[in-house]
Every structure is written in C-alpha cells, then in structure tokens.
Amino acid sequence: MIIIGGVIVVLFLLMIGTHVAVALGIVTAGMVLLTDGVPITVIAQTGFKSVNSYPLMAIPMFVLAGNLMMKGQLAHMIIELIGTVVRVLRGGLALTVLFTSVFFAAVSGSSVGSAAAIGAATVDGLRREKYPDRFAAGIVAVGGTLGLMIPPSLGFILIGTIVGLPIDRLFLAGIVPGLLEATLLMFSVVFLSHKYNYGTVAKTADFRGFFTKLPKAIPALLMPILVLGSIYAGIMTPTEVSAFAAVYALLIGLFFYRTISISGAWEAARDSLLQTTMIYAVVLGGSLIGFILVRMGVSAHLVSVLEQADLSWWQFLLIVNVVLLVLGMFLDGVTLIILTAPLLFPMAQVMGINPIHFAVIMVANVEIATLTPPIGLNLFVMSGIVRIPVHEVARGVLPFYVVRLFGLALLTFIPQLSLFFE
C-alpha cells in the first residue's frame, strides 16, 4: 500500500512541475518515516554513496566535451565534409545529418546534446533544400538518440554504476547495436526522400571538395578514434578518457580551429555544470527510492513472483519492453534507468538473460523514450530550434519511431547483436 501511494504521489508531483529529483526525495523521505527499522539518517548516507562514484565522474567530462564541440561548431565542419560525397543521393543532406549524429555520439554520449548541436548546424540547410520542417526536426531528433547507444554512452555509465557491470564491456556492446540503428535510419531516410521527393540531388560527388576539406577536419575526426581507442587499448579508463576528450575538444577549438573563445569555453563549462547537476540530482533521488524499495523487499518479491510465473525468456523481455515503453512516456531517460535497473536486472538474472544484453535492451528503450510524447526531451529541443509545435515534431518522428521499434525487436530477440564482442 505504501508503494502504491508513493507512486501516486510521485506522478502528482511531476504533473504539477516538481523536479524529478525533488519528487523522488520527498516520496523517499515519506516512505522512510512510514517504514519500521529504517533510520532517517540513511537518506543522507545513501544519497552521498550514490554520487560518490568514480565511474560517474565521467559524466560531467563527456557532457563538457559535447558542449565544447557544439561551441566550436565542429558539426558544421563534419556536415560540410560528408555532404560533398553523400549529397549525390536523394535525401543526401538528411543522410549527412545521420552520419554526423554517429560522429557526435562517439564523442559526447548525450542524446539531447547531439540533437541540439546538429539541429543548430543543419536546420537552415534542410529548409533551403525544401525538406518539410517536421521532417527536418524528426530526423535530427531521432539521430540524436544514437548518442545513448554508441559509446561513450551516458546511459551505459549509469547502468554500469548502478548494477556493477564493467563500463568498458557495456561500451563494446553498444557498437554493433548503435551502427545497426543508424543503418536502419539511413535506409528509412532514403526511402522517404524518394517517396516524397525530398531534397536536391547533386549531379556528381564532389571528391575534390572532399579532399580539400579533409585536412582541416582531421583533428575533429580523430577525436572519437582517440576516445574509443584509448579505452579499448587499455591506455585509459572511461573516466580518464572523458577528461581527455574535454581537454582535446577545448584545445582544438581554441588553437586549431579558433572557433571557441575564452567566454565561449566558460559558457560551455557553465552549461555542463547545470546539466550535470540535474543528472546527479536525479541519480541521488532515484538511488534513495531504489534503496527503500530493496529494503522493503520489493525486488525479492518480484523475483519470487517471476519464478512462479513460468515465463520463457522472450515473454519476459517482451513484457519488459512494454513496461519500459509505457514508463518512457512519463519519465526521462536518466530517471527511467535509475528507477528500473535495480528492480529489473535481478529478474533478468533469474531468467538467465545475459546482463550485457539486457543493458543494451534497456538503453534502446531509453532512446525511444527521448522521442515519446509528452516527456520526450528531443522533441522539445527540436521544437525550440525549428520553432514548430512539439506535436509537429512528433509527427516528423513518427516514421522513424516505427523503425526504432523494429530495431528494438531485433536487439531484444537476437542477443548476438549485443554480445558480438563478448
């Protein structure tokens, strides 16, 4: 009864505009007071332990790296380079958006940050080539979600920290699924562009322009190679490489491209601090409510119910996907991971599901959550950039939403895609 009441209170607080972390903190405090044998001091102790984590230190640095790339206008450079050869195809500029999304995903690990950076760099160009506003907003919004799957993913960092999985293995697991998702989106862009005659088509690929622009783009192109290569070569941990990424982005922006000023770097640092504070606040609030749920035996009870239900592994995963998709309508990605991971991973273990595979499934659901009304953050980001209503952005996302659901099904029922490097 306490749990049901807590859920109702959380939903009410969110509906009236209370910040997620505050809502979770209020409900947790109430549940602690109503639960026998749990001292109130446990709130401070558990909250501190939840954010006093070495792996979580990677989050502010990766966020800063993404913001510095955005301030340094690196998206413009990558778009111009790729566009010289890709725009020979129908829908070439939209394809360029997706290629650039993959690049940003391999550096920042943030969905919203990628969508904001790429949207600011491409929307005017998409409009000039007569792409409808809602299609332009939709393709950038859905491309931004790749930042959650392709390493270094903030989602994988959170999951690894919460359930104790190696973050470098989670990063490896996200490579094939991320590239698969990008490929499916590219095919859908080509199909829709041909069907509705979107965009202009260059007569020939501009290879001269490509090789002219390539030398200048090399420092930016090296960034994801250095970031991921350092992790997988064992040179740096994910936390260490996050700091390297931020410093590298700052140096090439200040001294090589000269597109970042001191004031711009300060703004990037300030924005990163605000974004990280919000993430940490949700981590703190979610860990508190997760602790009390475990203390009340909710996780153990769910495992017991699951053992008696006699479900097959695929039936369990189907139910999990439905639950996460529904919750994704009302919770942002960080909150969704923090609230559900402590409950779902023990259940997945009972079903004999590889935890790395299950982590990929969870991140794939979080990607879709960022596109799902009424909370989908990428919808609001693109609504602000393109200056169209959120429901119009949602209409633009709809064809790609179907593609993402198909991709989710593939990742769910073909574990080898997630375990390719295991």
Predicted regions and their residues:
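Alpha-helical transmembrane segments of multi-pass membrane transport proteins
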Residues: 1-422
